[in-house]
């Protein structure tokens, strides 16, 4: 006979004030929103990490930028992102661009969507909270990122070189080793270039 042991689990995350909520008449949509808010709490511990279900838990910049609007709806992320964007700026340069992960433990740099975090997250914080300070503080990094793209464009003005994640992990492509979707990765890169 085995004894039942009492186990205690402590949830840890950055203390970020709840600011938004969503409810509707559909139980499944409400459950989805609940899952989103819990995932945010589980993944926001000093840096925005990517996956609670794996042991990777890195500060992937693509995940952070694509989730930034939702994160700002759910919680007051202004100070959280302000601190993390300092980390992003410290790891970035005109020569290398912006890392895919911050803190940069992979030494991988400069692809659309991921590196666009340098522009998108400060813009989200400004749009949601009216904080011009985050734009001023990150202006150099923002400009250097856009200049990096411009410097890597061809004569036609399009960004068609270097590594790109493309539509990462999309399921609309025949089996391949590169894990990108069927959408042309440079089309996605140029769409983001226009956006930033």
Where are these regions (language model features)?
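Hydrophobic alpha-helical segments typical of transmembrane helices
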Residues: 84, 121-122
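Active-site acid/base region of carbohydrate-active enzymes
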Residues: 11-35, 41-42, 48-100, 109, ...
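Single conserved hydrophobic/aromatic residue that forms the stacking wall/gate
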Residues: 1-10
